[in-house]
Swiss-Prot record:
Belongs to the RNA polymerase beta chain family. It comes from Azotobacter vinelandii (strain DJ / ATCC BAA-1303). The keyword Nucleotidyltransferase applies. One of its GO terms (molecular function) is DNA-directed RNA polymerase activity. GO terms for cellular component: DNA-directed RNA polymerase complex. The gene is rpoB. Its EC number is 2.7.7.6. This is DNA-directed RNA polymerase subunit beta. The RNAP catalytic core consists of 2 alpha, 1 beta, 1 beta' and 1 omega subunit. When a sigma factor is associated with the core the holoenzyme is formed, which can initiate transcription. Pfam families: RNA_pol_Rpb2_1 (PF04563), RNA_pol_Rpb2_2 (PF04561), RNA_pol_Rpb2_3 (PF04565), RNA_pol_Rpb2_45 (PF10385), RNA_pol_Rpb2_6 (PF00562), RNA_pol_Rpb2_7 (PF04560). It catalyses: RNA(n) + a ribonucleoside 5'-triphosphate = RNA(n+1) + diphosphate.
Length: 1358
């Protein structure tokens, strides 16, 4: 196998047994693909698909005026170029967006002509606002902050059948219902009531009998009965009544009379229940008609209107009950045929017939009026209004859209073959839904499971943006319609008609403040990736926390391979916010799909299919870990499979699919936990969530025990620098990498050079530090996709969230009580968990009513010492180390004129004006903060003079840009001249450049000429002359292009900044704060084992082993058994082996053993023990082997993939190879006494993370401060500089101790006794420590509240 640039420097030993059939797909695809579909940028007009912006425009245009004499048509759109690149947008606090220009055509028709002849056509491009662009990492920059749009999991449009689970009625009877959910438009519900009549609701309003809707659709009673029921036909003869017999319909009934065959033999005796055997006999006997007594017909319902044959008079209406009197009338009128509805109690209930009986309407108009009254109560109905309203509800494409998904789901559910159709409902659709509902009530068919992932779909960014865009367009449409009537008379152009504000506002609102547009979690690369792969059931059109029950939150069988069963937040959102599984993707309808290998007759193929939850149900799916022989055949007699969402076992030949990988069940974060299979699910959940809170450490350290997913996460997260094209490293320094691209990868017209500017010490959304470090050296060869620089929390292109620590599981003096953690001082000395946090502090100079604020170093009443870190512009130097209270930016604000005393006037006259009329409002370092200034940015509005600092910053930026462009030109020029040299050497020259005719050119001649002179050469070969001319033109073009680029950047830098109204200047100061680990910080492993650092001990006091190596960290063994996360113990053992092997390699290097020995030992490590994949060490040269061995000194990194990791025997073998005890335990000695502990202790290496819950951010103290307005009690919380609440239980505690005075002090002068506390403050200042308690303010509030209840309470003094 081929290793990438970073892989061969440090190969990870892989313990997996199963082959990788499919690589983990690109992890951000769900975001990028969705938004690409939405924009369709760069797609030619004829290839535009009907999605995204294009679909939104097509659905709203053409807009036709009310008179019909003018129309505005949509022709196409184009996206402009962004004004600033991503970094500039973040810096300036603007949105990364492109202008959208739409070409529209205004057509004016001739009023006079009959056939609408076109009078005038105008085409024009109209600006429709800005559309935010997605960065290449799947985020949006909105107002300078990086945001993520989270995908939403919502109920798919379509039709759903459900029941109330017996909760509505006291009898526990199941009431069935059907609901048609469109993508947009009114919901239509059908439901049964406890009396078994069917009702309809529109948009969850009051219910009407369902027959009202059918009548409004134009069905008569007879047609309705015809649709829903079969009929029994009775013939009236001289002898009485005879029934046209359909034997199947008698099944289950009790015979009211003897049923005989033609010969008179009794088949069913009276009073017996008719069974399937009886029906067979009846069918054999071939009885077509059956004489029945009169009582058999009594109580049945007529299916047709019964008319007097001679007079035409109606004897019985359709759907009326046949009574004794009616039958007499029928007999008298000599009616020969009666049709009744066939109903029974088993599978054909009289529900629709009963509903028709309670329906008061009789015709279509009455039904329409009834619906109008329900939808618009209180408005007088007219025929037209009622018809229009009803048609707009479900039959108008403008108001109602099922969408392609909805139609597909609808048709599939009601059993139609085709999956395409209209977006609006038809009469047949509504009737089919009712039929299905009645069938389900009759016991034929089952209800849907709304938590099945076949009934829930994912709405991604693109789709949500399209919906918002459409909302904006619809608002525009209303305005345009009104203006169109003026267009014909006033000769307006399209841009006069369209006001783009509503569109821009809708888009801005969605990206800026939608519930699903979230501030990106940027703690570390994993938290970024997880945030982009999150799927939320909350948000507009989704669920709310309060209403979501247990079922929605629960793990469903269809989650397998689509949504992670582990990773979800703890707390109120549990189960509502999920993470995509590692291999999941969405299909064209938005349903989640998972990949499977195809299995044919027990033979597993390499063909991979992606199936949604619906498609997968009928398949028999084997686990990825099913045993196969070497030809890929299933060999077990019974294979564990999933079928119909159940786990079961089947024979190999029944299996149709097989999982792709064991990790396809879990999400990215969960797949980073080694030995996940040995952890309890609750702890695994905490482990996945806490990895996202790990703060990037100063020096990232790869995990010794990983899972092999680390590289994928680091690469896909976008924090590393990945080579766009292969080539040779031309130059590299800390802030940029220049690559000379391989010739075969350079396309014509492109420069053969790639320049990568690295991000240095930048602030992330969570105030952590983003910094990139180059991994390559000058002259290295890199291929496309290689990692050239590490970002935060990555080490050689692998995710590295924490540090490998030597741990011992043992109690230690009670310092590790309740999950506390005991650390060694060495960890602090080596800066293992030191993190850098960057804070942005902003100083804004505004234009006030009294005059402009000024940023200056001339601040009144401030000593020289306070100003020694500021430059002449009043702004702090970069590199200054500042403490709390230091001035960062000097600023003065004019203050209002006050009446001056004569003395002040005199002083002013003597010492001049300035000092008094301004006050100091400088930006100072906040309390509890100390750090180093690492960057300053100055933004000045247009028209305001820029200060010296702003100009200096601008000069520096221009130098950087110029340096990049020069470098690019140097390499392009070099490559061009190399090509020319190859062509010219050996050719004959005709003269020019001071050479004689007939000179043969060699390297010496060319080296003697200046490069500009080369183009003056006249060659004998015309082709060479042409090549020289082309090269000269090409270089001139390149130079011009780069100069234009420079001028463009310069223009951008020199133009004023777009600041908020009233703001003259903004100065941003960035402070880097170094935080060492200290007691009170929260740490965790990857298995949900979290704790707080309780004590940092001197190295000499820590337990040490027989070699004298002390442990770094002591954990409590009691934290393991009850929590059932045994994975951490296995990780510790394997970590010990990894470290031991590293030490062994280190000894070999120090003893300067031969490379062959090293190679052999590495072969043992990588290829002898466990794992299927053999590492191809022979492909590495000796120098590469030495390089690899040197990188392995700290430990051989291992990968134990989830559900396919190292076995116990393999861990033991690894320990043995490292010459360590196979038990993983060793005797330790007490550092303080030197005595041996009485039992062996588990010691090893565990990967520990420092979480973003730092004691520095939480520690807080208050003496006096702000008070709440009403109660006069101190505010709460660090942000408000609040106090500690002395609550109910604390009061009880003091009462229990009888500490009356302390209690009084707590409730009065220390809280809300206003006079008492001011008096006490004065007393303390005077050195008098007495206190007098008065009346607490909250008591007055209480009295006021009692008075508001109408009870007058007064306090009277005795």
């Amino acid at each position: 196998m081929a290793y990438s640039y970073t892989e061969k420097k440090r190969i990870r030993k892989d313990f997996s047994k199963l082959p990788d059939v499919m690589d983990v797909p690109y992890l951000l695809a769900i975001q990028l693909d969705s938004y690409r579909e939405f924009l369709q940028a760069g797609v030619s007009k004829d290839k535009l698909r009907d999605v995204g912006l294009h679909a939104a425009f097509k659905s709203v245009f053409p807009i036709i005026s009310y008179s019909g004499n003018a129309a505005l048509e949509y022709v196409g759109y184009r996206l402009g170029e962004p004004a600033f690149d991503v970094k500039e947008c973040v810096l300036r606090g603007v949105t990364f967006a492109v202008p959208l220009r739409v070409k529209v055509r205004l057509i004016i028709f001739d009023k006079e002509s009959s056939n609408k002849a076109i009078k005038d056509i105008k085409e024009q491009e109209v600006y429709m606002g800005e559309i935010p662009l997605m960065t290449e990492n799947g985020t949006f920059i909105v107002n300078g902050t990086e945001r993520v749009i989270v995908s939403q999991l919502h109920r798919s449009p379509g039709v759903f059948f459900d029941h109330d689970r017996g909760k509505t009625h006291s009898s526990g009877k199941l009431l069935y219902s059907a609901r048609i959910i469109p993508y947009r438009g009114s919901w239509l519900d059908f439901e049964f009531d406890p009396k078994d009549a069917v009702f309809v609701r529109i948009d969850r309003r009051r219910k009407l009998p369902a027959s009202v809707l059918l009548r409004a659709l134009g069905y008569s009673t007879e047609e309705v009965l015809d649709i829903f029921y079969d009929t029994n036909v009775f013939h009236v003869t001289e002898q009485g009544l005879s029934l046209e017999l359909v034997p199947q319909r008698l099944r289950g009934e009790i015979a009211v009379f003897d049923i005989k065959d033609a010969s008179g033999k009794v088949i069913v005796e009276q009073g017996r229940r008719i069974t399937a055997r009886h029906i067979n006999q009846l069918e054999k006997a071939g009885i077509k008609e059956l004489d029945v007594p009169l009582e058999y017909v009594l109580g049945r319902t007529s299916a047709k209107v019964i008319v007097h044959p001679s007079t035409g008079e109606i004897i019985a209406e359709c759907n009326s009950e046949l009574t004794q009197d009616l039958l007499v009338k029928i007999a008298k009128a000599q009616v020969v045929r009666i049709e009744t509805l066939y109903t029974n109690d088993i599978d054909c209930g009289p529900f629709i017939s009963d509903t028709l009986k309670i329906d008061s309407t009789t015709n279509q108009l009455e039904a329409l009026v009834e619906i109008y009254r329900m939808m618009r109560p209180g408005e007088p109905p007219t025929k037209d209004a009622a018809e229009t309203l009803f048609n707009n509800l479900f039959f108008s494409a403008e108001r109602y859209d099922l969408s392609a998904v909805g139609r597909m789901k609808f048709n599939r559910r009601i059993g139609r073959e085709e999956i395409e159709g209209a977006g609006v409902l038809s009469r047949e659709d509504i009737v089919d839904v009712l039929k299905t509902l009645v069938d389900i009530r009759n016991g034929k068919g089952i209800v849907d499971d709304i938590d099945h992932l076949g009934n829930r779909r994912v709405r991604c960014v693109g789709e949500m943006a399209e919906n918002q865009f459409r909302v904006g367009l619809v608002r525009v449409e209303r305005a345009v319609k009104e203006r169109l009537s003026m267009a014909e008379s006033e000769g307006l152009m399209p841009q006069d008609l369209i006001n783009a504000k509503p569109v821009a506002a809708a888009v801005k609102e969605f990206f800026g403040s939608s519930q699903l547009s979230q501030f990106m979690d940027q703690n570390n690369p994993l938290s970024e990736i997880t945030h982009k792969r999150r799927v939320s059931a909350l948000g507009p059109g989704g669920l709310t926390r309060e209403r979501a029950g247990f079922e929605v939150r629960d793990v469903h069988p269809t989650h397998y391979g689509r949504v992670c069963p582990i990773e979800t937040p703890e707390g109120p959102n549990i189960g509502l916010i999920n993470s995509l599984a590692a291999y999941a993707r969405t299909n064209q309808y938005g349903f989640l799909e998972s990949p499977y290998r195809v299995v044919k007759e027990g033979q597993v193929t390499d063909e991979i299919v992606f199936l949604s939850a619906i498609e997968e149900a009928d398949h028999v799916i084997a686990q990825a870990s099913a045993t196969l022989d070497e030809n890929g055949r299933l060999i077990d007699e019974l294979v564990a499979v999933r079928h119909l969402n159940e786990f079961t076992v089947k024979a190999p030949e029944d299996v149709t699919l097989m999982d792709v990988s064991p990790r396809q069940v879990v999400s990215v974060a969960a797949s980073l936990i080694p030995f996940l299979e040995h952890d309890d699910a609750n702890r695994a959940l905490m482990g996945s969530n806490m990895q996202r809170q790990a703060v990037p450490t100063l020096r990232a350290d790869k995990p010794l025990v990983g899972t092999g997913m680390e590289r994928n996460v680091a690469r896909d997260s976008g924090v590393c620098v990945v080579a766009r094209r292969g080539g040779v490293i031309d130059s590299v320094d800390a802030s940029r990498i220049v690559v000379r691209v391989n010739n075969d990868e350079v396309e014509t017209g492109e420069a053969g050079v790639d320049i990568y500017n690295l991000t240095k010490y930048t602030r992330s959304n969570q105030n952590t530090c983003i910094n990139q470090r180059p991994l390559v050296s000058k002259g290295d060869q890199v291929a496309r996709g290689d990692i050239m620089a590490d970002g935060p929390s990555t080490d050689m292109g692998e995710l590295a969230l924490g540090q490998n620590m030597r741990v011992a599981f043992m109690p230690w003096n009670g310092f590790n009580f309740e999950d506390s953690i005991c650390l060694s001082e060495r960890v602090v000395q080596e800066d293992r968990f030191t993190t850098i946090h960057i804070q942005e502090l902003t100083c804004v100079a505004r234009d006030t009513k009294l005059g402009p604020e000024e940023i200056t170093a001339d601040i009144p009443n401030v000593g020289e010492a306070a100003l020694n870190k500021l430059d002449e512009a009043g702004i702090v130097y970069v590199g200054a180390e500042v403490m709390a209270g230091d001035i960062l930016v000097g600023k003065v604000t004019p203050k209002g004129e006050t009446q001056l005393t004569p003395e002040e006037k005199l002083l002013r006259a003597i010492f001049g004006e300035k000092a008094s009329d301004v006050k100091d409002t400088s930006l100072r370092v906040p309390t509890g903060t100390k750090g180093t200034v690492i960057d300053v940015q100055v933004f000045t509005r247009d028209g305001v003079e820029r200060d010296s600092r702003a100009l200096a910053i601008e000069r520096m930026q221009l130098d950087e840009i110029r340096k990049d462009l020069n470098e690019e030109f140097r390499i392009v020029e070099g490559a061009t001249f190399e090509r020319l040299r190859a062509a010219l050497v050996g050719a004959v020259c005709e003269g020019g450049a001071g050479l004689k005719k007939g000179t043969e050119i060699d390297d010496g001649i060319l080296d003697g000429l200046e490069r500009g002179q080369w183009f003056k050469l006249r060659m004998a070969d015309d082709a060479l002359n042409e090549q020289l001319e082309k090269a000269q033109a090409y270089l001139a073009d390149r130079r011009q292009l780069l100069d234009d680029k420079f001028e463009d950047k310069k223009r951008k830098l020199q133009q004023g900044d777009d600041l908020a109204p009233g703001v003259l200047k903004i100065v941003k100061v960035y402070l880097a704060i170094k935080r060492r680990i200290q007691p009170g910080d929260k740490m965790a492993g990857r298995h949900g084992n979290k704790g707080v650092v309780s004590v940092i001990m001197p190295v000499e006091d820590m337990p040490y082993d027989a070699n004298g190596t002390p442990v770094d960290i002591v954990l409590n063994p009691l934290g393991v058994p009850s929590r059932m996360n045994v994975g951490q113990i296995l990780e510790t053992h394997l970590g010990l082996a990894a470290k031991g092997l590293g030490e062994k390699i280190n000894r070999m290097l120090e003893e300067q053993r031969k490379v062959a020995e090293l190679r052999q030992f590495l072969g043992e490590v990588y290829n002898e023990i466990g794992g299927r994949q053999k590492e191809d060490l022979d492909s590495l040269s000796d120098s590469e082997i030495l390089d690899l061995a040197s990188n392995l000194r700290g430990g051989v990194p291992m990968a134990t993939p989830v559900f396919d990791g190292a076995r116990e025997t393999e861990i033991k073998a690894m320990l043995k190879l490292a010459d360590l005890p196979e038990s993983g335990q060793m005797r330790l000695f007490d550092g303080r006494t030197g005595n041996q502990f009485e039992r062996p202790t588990t010691v090893g290496y565990m990967y520990m993370l420092k979480l973003n819950h730092l004691v520095d951010d939480k520690m807080h103290a208050r003496s006096t401060g702000s008070y709440s307005l009403v109660t006069q009690q101190p505010l709460g919380g660090k942000a408000q500089f609040g106090g500690q609440r002395f609550g109910e239980m604390e009061v009880w505690a003091l009462e229990a101790y009888g500490a009356a005075y302390t209690l009084q002090e707590m409730l009065t002068v220390k809280s809300d006794d206003v006079n008492g506390r001011t008096k006490m403050y004065k007393n303390i200042v005077d050195g008098d420590h007495r206190m007098e308690a008065g009346m607490p303010e909250s008591f007055n509030v209480l009295i006021k509240e009692i008075r508001s209840l109408g009870i007058d309470i007064e306090l009277e003094t005795e």
